[in-house]
Amino acid sequence: MMSKLGVLLTICLLLFPLSVLPLDGDQLADQPARHAQSAERNARFHPVKRCCPFPMCYQVPHCPCCG
């Protein structure tokens, strides 16, 4: 009886490993906004025009003046 229970437990752990359980928010995929680069935080961003100078704009994601 105990060996059958051990085999069943082993099979269950192989089919459903503990690593697939979600952790407590320490994964980067759970917090995409915190790790995204903002155009306002970029040194090339012009606060009055609300965009970047044209030659530099291609490197800034989601820049309002370049699309």
Curated annotation (Swiss-Prot):
Signal peptide: 1-22
Cellular component per GO, a single term: extracellular region
Compartmental location: Secreted
The keyword Oxidoreductase is assigned to this record: no
Positions carrying Cysteine amide: C66
Keyword list, A-Z: Amidation, Cleavage on pair of basic residues, Disulfide bond, Secreted, Signal, Toxin
Proregion residues excised on maturation: 23-50
Disulphide bridges, residue numbers: C51-C65, C52-C63, C57-C66
GO MF annotation, one: toxin activity
Keyword set includes Secreted: yes
Tissue-by-tissue expression: Expressed by the venom duct.
UniProt main location, coarse: secreted
Pfam families the UniProt entry points to: Conotoxin
InterPro entries: Conotoxin
Family label: Belongs to the conotoxin M superfamily.
Written domain comment of the UniProt record: The cysteine framework is III (CC-C-C-CC). Classified in the M-1 branch, since 1 residue stands between the fourth and the fifth cysteine residues.
Protein name: Conotoxin reg3.8
Lineage: Eukaryota, Metazoa, Spiralia, Lophotrochozoa, Mollusca
